[in-house]
Amino acid sequence: MKTDIEIAREAKLKRISDIAKDIGIEEKYLEPYGKYIAKVDLKFLKTLNNKKDGKLILVTAITPTPAGEGKTTTSIGLSMALNRLGKKSIVTLREPSLGPVFGIKGGAAGGGYSQVLPMENINLHFTGDIHAISSAHNLISAVIDSHIKFGNNLNINPTKVFWKRTMDMNDRALRQIIVGLGGNANGLPREDGFIITAASEIMAILCLAKDLKDLKERLGNIVVAESFDKKLVRVKDLKIEGALTALLKDAINPNIVQTIENTPAFIHGGPFANIAHGTNSIIATKLALKLTDYVVTEAGFAADLGAEKFLDFVTQVGNFDVNAVVLVATIKALKYHGGIKKDELNKENVDAMLKGMENLKTHIENLKLYNVPVVVALNVFASDTTNELKAFSEHCNAPHALVRAFEKGSKGTIELANTVLENISDSKHIPILNPEMSIEEKIETLATKVYRARKVIYTDTAKSKLKFLKRHGFETLPVIVAKTQSSISDDPKKLNAPRDYNFTIRDFELSAGAGFVVALAGEIMRMPGLSKIPNAVNIDVDEDGNIVGLS
């Protein structure tokens, strides 16, 4: 089979103005970035207020494995298949981060015959949104250190600066650094560090803001430090929320592209689901809901991460409902959770697959807590055997369909589309987290009901930070749990369906502008590192200027 990039280059793309026109976006609301990419002016969304929302289909997955599950490929294929069936559908996705593109994961534009295009642009710089977020984030850092040097009127305690710097790259060497070295001219030396841009609170804010006014207010509410007299220092105290908004005024407008079969796609924002809320911007989702009958959106990593945060938090902020959830699984992933090593996953092993189905079963049970229909999408690989597929079908305790989007595009996803249409609901999903719950109650609910832990343990650091949050009035903020994506638990080594263990919260981080508290579990890092052999070594440019090795 041809490579992703070869398939992408053979696709017959329409001009983006035609794609936009087909779904009712007037050209005056488009800001083109070449022939095939455009931004949609936020003002257009306001003209659609009286239109009824379409139905929302959330795509998530079982606990990810090194073999890959194909969630984005399935999302794109499902949206294309709905259109092939005569329905109207738009897919909404997150923007890829350069860190994973050059790291172990690779690109995030789908694969095979189920891609969003132009994939090279989308996977690399795209429309510059992530650059704008990085610039805004680092402006805050620069102003903080400048303020401390020139008088420090806000009495900022340099040892209590919470705001780290950022860049859109995996670079473990920057996790902990010292800034201000080299004498008085360079500022006050202090400990600092970098996080990846996808983990920036500004990324979360951009994806949660409903308009420019809301964006500016949220930016102003970011807590960056504590003063010597124990007062919180916010961005609005530094008087730079206007400058930050200026840097982001174009980035807040959603990006429109197309799939390989010319289905419209909004790609906007890219928070990770293991360290943030893990889905594209609310603006992009709301715009899609106003323009089509069926919106397919994706939440990062597994159902215990992205889907939980989407169902408990994102939908509440965005004021929309989920009408069906698609849970992506693979035979390989099930065998991996059943104890089979990565290099042996291509060998038939029905017993291991059935053992690994406990992971699938757990995610199905968790999703049903939200009163939402669940459809399992089994992403089929060439190595899957007839015996394995038969055993899966016999033991899967939810409506399910086989998916071949990678090799057949929409034609390989028709079965899934029909199964979703048969099961989709008009009823409202029910979050399991109540806004009035305390931080501890929210974590306890997630740990016992979703992560299947015995109890929650708080380190001394976490207990101290909890007191800080309560002292400053943040005790009922929504909670985003940052934990490993490789296990339902807080330990990446606990595969399949761990039960009856202690779930440890080691620290908390406040995202007052985004409107949530991050509970850090296990050893999760907000600045990833590159693998021993990163994907970067596979990427090149030929003599004609064509990128090769990107997938």
From Swiss-Prot:
Phosphoprotein listed as a keyword: no
Catalytic activity, as annotated: (6S)-5,6,7,8-tetrahydrofolate + formate + ATP = (6R)-10-formyltetrahydrofolate + ADP + phosphate
Keywords, ordered alphabetically: ATP-binding, Ligase, Nucleotide-binding, One-carbon metabolism
CDD domains: FTHFS
Gene: fhs
SUPFAM superfamilies (UniProt xref): P-loop containing nucleoside triphosphate hydrolases
E.C. designation(s): 6.3.4.3
Lineage, top ranks: Bacteria, Thermotogati, Thermotogota, Thermotogae, Thermotogales
Domain of life: Bacteria
NCBIfam families: PRK13505.1 (NF010030)
GO terms classed as biological process: tetrahydrofolate interconversion
Protein name: Formate--tetrahydrofolate ligase
